[in-house]
């Protein structure tokens, strides 16, 4: 088995899915932005230094989040981010897809898995990352995801064990025994955590002693000032574009590890800005094509509207990373003590 990135067939399937979106699904999707991203929780560097407690994302298990992801996954599959994450720049000469592959090799190395070990992907999407990690390590993959449509896609993948993938919610008790896994990882779903103590505690519980927990997700950086209107606007635009929930200073992530009992092995942020520029340019082209096709009545206007809504204010995303207000790739590695 050799890992393959998103194919033309995948993209055509996503386009067909978008063209089949009902009016009810369309209106539900468009309404999720106000429901999910208005007054989302933030904890900045200043909050951390003042001892302000972490405020979780209360809508992390909501029906609105499921509705959002049913459509967002289709839109992302048109580009390079079917796996639902923007990778850090590992090799600037390579594509977004190739940098995802390089990044996943780093994750596989961090997980320290052997053949036959069990590894859990939290927020596994359609299982594409799990498939690659299994290929790299020889481990047996498991995954949970809130969106049933993506789990259905994982079930159709002949390279994944169907019974190991399920609709699940990391804001609730994980339906696995204590010490069930040799490693756990989460690639950009963790801003939907409602209660960090609970979720990190559940990860700790299902890990074997010595097991690794690797997380890569959005974090606020030192430069972000919530009282600066310009910066606050950039972050809000980026939140809506990349659909992250809570926005927390990276030290809060580190504390979530250590308070759960993990030994923090490493914690580092990486830039994705060059990857972001490429993907934004691609979706700008998609937006222009969709607008034209809708104008001449080849595709429904609602298909064009969904693309425009997702790609709205995309330049803010680039600017926010360039100003070092945030990273989409704060990478933490923790180990459960032996």
Predicted feature locations:
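Class I SAM-dependent methyltransferase SAM/SAH-binding core
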Residues: 120, 129-172
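Conserved class I S-adenosyl-L-methionine
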Residues: 116-123
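Substrate-binding/catalytic lobe of Class I Rossmann-like enzymes that use SAM or dcSAM, i.e.
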Residues: 227-229, 233-322, 326, 337
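N-terminal auxiliary segments of SAM/dcSAM-dependent transferases
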Residues: 2-76
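A short acidic, Gly/Pro-enriched loop at the edge of an enzyme's catalytic core
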Residues: 171-184
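Conserved alpha-helix/loop element of class I SAM-dependent methyltransferases that forms part
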Residues: 97-115
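A short glycine-rich, Lys/Arg-flanked "PGG" loop and its adjoining helix->strand segment in the class I
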Residues: 197-212
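A short SAM/SAH-binding and catalytic strip from SAM-dependent methyltransferases
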Residues: 183-194
């Amino acid at each position: 088995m050799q890992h393959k990135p998103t194919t033309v067939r995948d993209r055509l399937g996503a386009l067909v899915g978008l063209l089949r979106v009902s009016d009810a699904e369309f209106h539900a999707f468009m309404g999720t932005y106000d429901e999910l991203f208005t007054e989302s929780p933030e904890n900045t560097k200043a909050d951390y230094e003042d001892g302000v407690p972490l405020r979780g994302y209360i809508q992390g298990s909501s029906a609105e989040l499921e509705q959002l992801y049913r459509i967002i996954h289709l839109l992302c599959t048109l580009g390079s981010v079917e796996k639902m994450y923007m990778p850090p720049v590992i090799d600037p000469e390579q594509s977004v897809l190739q940098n995802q592959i390089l990044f996943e090799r780093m994750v596989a190395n961090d997980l320290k898995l052997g053949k036959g070990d069990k590894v859990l992907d939290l927020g596994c999407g359609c299982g594409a990352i799990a498939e690659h990690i299994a290929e790299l390590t020889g481990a047996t993959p498991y995954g949970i995801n809130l969106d049933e449509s993506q789990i259905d896609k994982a079930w159709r993948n002949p390279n994944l064990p169907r019974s190991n993938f399920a609709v699940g919610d990391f804001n609730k008790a994980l339906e696995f025994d204590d010490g069930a896994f040799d490693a756990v990882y989460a690639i950009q779903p963790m801003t939907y955590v409602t209660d960090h103590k609970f979720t990190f505690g559940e990860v700790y519980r299902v890990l074997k002693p010595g097991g690794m927990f690797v997380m890569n997700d959005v974090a606020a950086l030192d430069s972000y000032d919530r009282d600066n209107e310009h910066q606050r606007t950039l972050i809000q635009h980026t939140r809506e574009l990349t659909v992250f929930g809570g926005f927390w200073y990276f030290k809060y992530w580190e504390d979530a590890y250590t308070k759960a009992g993990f030994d923090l092995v490493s914690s580092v942020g990486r830039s994705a800005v060059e990857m972001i520029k490429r993907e934004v340019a691609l979706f700008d082209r998609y937006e222009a094509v969709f607008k034209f096709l809708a104008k001449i009545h080849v595709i429904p206007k609602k298909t064009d509207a969904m693309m425009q809504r997702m790609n709205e204010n995309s330049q803010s995303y680039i600017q926010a990373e360039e100003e070092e207000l945030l990273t989409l790739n704060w990478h933490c590695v923790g180990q459960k003590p032996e």
